């Protein structure tokens, strides 16, 4: 057995990569809560945007400092998008204290590389060590991206789109549910692109046909749905499939004005209203989440006003807003008409204020209703209180439901009365 102290930065896809690595070393792995008790310290980094790069580097440097005072120093391994973006050779010259660099070019090779560095004798076998508890788990269905948005570094870091075969994903889904997982959340850079590169006859629907019948699965949630991939055919399949598929749509629209979408390299999404209307044609009561970028090069007051009007009209259930940052190596970083930071930040904050009012109004409708709540974990401070989620709340990104009463425990799916609503959260009693 080896003890591991791990840090996963960035998105859920990184967390899945960490879980696969730790579950595939060919020996039993014991997670520990302090690096002084670890045989190996693993940092899975993010490098998607500059703040993530800075956080990753800061985390590595702070960890090196913490390790320097230990009598027995664990092996330090660094993986993830920071390594993919800057390369192991360049990073090693700046951070020689790191023992092992795990590059993104072949994530499947990580277990063998780490096992070799640890001098482990057991055979490396595919596996997964869950870190999310019994209620939910992410299922990463592909890696990389075939799109070339002008602001995005992902294709250069993660490479082109590569689907994981359906039989592999079905086996993993069955294993996760057998461990007690109630909700599977499908993630990828573009979930709707699954199957395009491996000849799946009906694309994502082919995979869903394999996953939906998994015995014991209570919820199946889809994240990162590319606007162009939400075809009428896919939406029709999803409507007809029904439970355990939840009518939750995470669609990163990024903007609403065609001028800005064109500059973003997303001309296929130049009419986001049609995307929203298409979803609501099939799912009138769908929960809609989106992410938007403000302050993109060339964004004028008129462009921003159009975006604000779009948000007010559409009334998303959940929304994230990001102030644009120029990323080295992307076409957008070289564009003229860069927007001042103070303007970008004001636009972000103002748009989130608009969304806060919308969210509060939409959640208030649920007060007095009865909802199924999937219980995630005990509250850290209040005994007897747990946190969970309704079908319209995705883990770790949306609001939560505070729930208490008989039978409330992690992994339980309970019927509860919504007794109070807040801006982003709910309060429920069984």
Swiss-Prot record:
Report the EC number(s), separated by commas if there are several.
2.8.4.4
Cofactor names from the entry are: [4Fe-4S] cluster
Record keywords, A-Z: 4Fe-4S, Cytoplasm, Iron, Iron-sulfur, Metal-binding, S-adenosyl-L-methionine, Transferase
Q: What region holds the MTTase N-terminal domain?
A: 2-119
Query: What are the record's GO terms for cellular component?
Result: cytosol
Q: Which GO terms describe its biological process?
A: tRNA modification
Chief localization class? cytoplasm
Where does the record place the Radical SAM core domain?
131-361
One GO MF term attached to the UniProt entry: 4 iron, 4 sulfur cluster binding
Q: Which compartment or compartments is the protein found in? A: Cytoplasm
Question: CDD domains from the entry?
Answer: Radical_SAM (cd01335)
Cofactor: binding details: Binds 2 [4Fe-4S] clusters. One cluster is coordinated with 3 cysteines and an exchangeable S-adenosyl-L-methionine.
Enzymatic reactions: L-aspartate(89)-[ribosomal protein uS12]-hydrogen + (sulfur carrier)-SH + AH2 + 2 S-adenosyl-L-methionine = 3-methylsulfanyl-L-aspartate(89)-[ribosomal protein uS12]-hydrogen + (sulfur carrier)-H + 5'-deoxyadenosine + L-methionine + A + S-adenosyl-L-homocysteine + 2 H(+)
Residues binding [4Fe-4S] cluster 1, per UniProt: 11, 46, 81
Q: Which residues form the TRAM domain?
A: 364-430
In terms of domain of life, where is this protein from? Bacteria
- Where does this protein hold [4Fe-4S] cluster 2? 145, 149, 152
Task: Show the InterPro entries listed in the entry.
Answer: Elp3/MiaA/NifB-like_rSAM, Methylthiotransferase, Methylthiotransferase_CS, Methylthiotransferase_N, Methylthiotransferase_N_sf, NA-bd_OB-fold, Ribosomal_uS12_MeSTrfase_RimO, rSAM
What role is this protein assigned? Catalyzes the methylthiolation of an aspartic acid residue of ribosomal protein uS12.
This chain belongs to which protein, by name?
A: Ribosomal protein uS12 methylthiotransferase RimO
- Organism name: Nitratidesulfovibrio vulgaris (strain DP4) (Desulfovibrio vulgaris)
């Amino acid at each position: 057995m080896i003890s591991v102290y791990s840090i996963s930065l960035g998105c859920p896809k990184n967390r899945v990569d960490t879980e696969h690595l730790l579950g595939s070393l060919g020996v039993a792995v014991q997670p520990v809560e302090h690096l002084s008790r670890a045989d190996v310290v693993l940092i899975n980094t993010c490098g998607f945007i500059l703040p993530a790069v800075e956080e990753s580097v800061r985390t590595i440097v702070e960890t090196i400092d913490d390790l320097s005072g230990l009598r027995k120093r664990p092996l330090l391994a660094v993986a993830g998008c920071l390594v993919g973006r800057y390369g192991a050779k360049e990073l090693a010259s700046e951070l020689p204290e790191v023992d092992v660099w795990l590059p993104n070019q072949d994530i499947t090779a990580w277990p063998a590389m780490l096992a070799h560095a640890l001098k482990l004798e057991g055979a490396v076998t595919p596996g997964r060590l869950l870190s999310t508890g019994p209620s939910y788990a992410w299922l990463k269905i592909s890696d990389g991206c075939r799109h070339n948005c002008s602001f995005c570094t992902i294709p250069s870091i993660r490479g082109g789109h590569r689907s994981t075969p359906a039989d592999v994903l079905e086996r993993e889904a069955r294993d996760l549910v057998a461990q007690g997982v109630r909700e599977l959340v499908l993630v990828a850079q573009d979930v709707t692109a699954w199957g395009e590169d491996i000849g799946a006859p009906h694309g994502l629907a082919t995979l869903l046909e394999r996953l939906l019948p998994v015995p014991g699965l209570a919820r199946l949630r889809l994240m990162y749905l590319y606007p162009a991939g939400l075809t009428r055919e896919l939406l029709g399949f999803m409507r007809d499939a029904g439970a355990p598929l939840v009518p939750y749509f995470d669609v990163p629209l990024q903007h609403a004005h065609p001028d800005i979408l064109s500059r973003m390299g997303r001309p296929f999404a130049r009419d986001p209203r049609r995307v929203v209307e298409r979803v609501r044609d099939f799912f009138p009561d769908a929960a809609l989440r989106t992410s938007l970028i403000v302050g993109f090069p060339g964004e004028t007051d008129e462009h921003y006003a159009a975006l604000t009007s779009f948000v007010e009209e559409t009334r998303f259930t959940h929304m994230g807003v990001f102030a644009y940052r120029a990323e080295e190596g992307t076409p957008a970083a070289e564009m003229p008409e860069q927007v001042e930071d103070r303007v970008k930040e004001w636009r972000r904050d103002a748009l989130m204020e608009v969304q806060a009012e919308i969210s509060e109004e939409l959640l208030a409708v649920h007060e007095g209703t009865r909802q199924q709540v999937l219980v995630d974990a005990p509250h850290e401070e209040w005994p007897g209180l747990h946190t969970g989620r309704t079908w319209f709340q995705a883990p770790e990104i949306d609001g939560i439901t505070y729930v208490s009463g008989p039978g409330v425990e992690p992994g339980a799916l309970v019927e509860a009365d919504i007794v109070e609503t807040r801006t982003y959260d709910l309060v429920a009693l069984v």
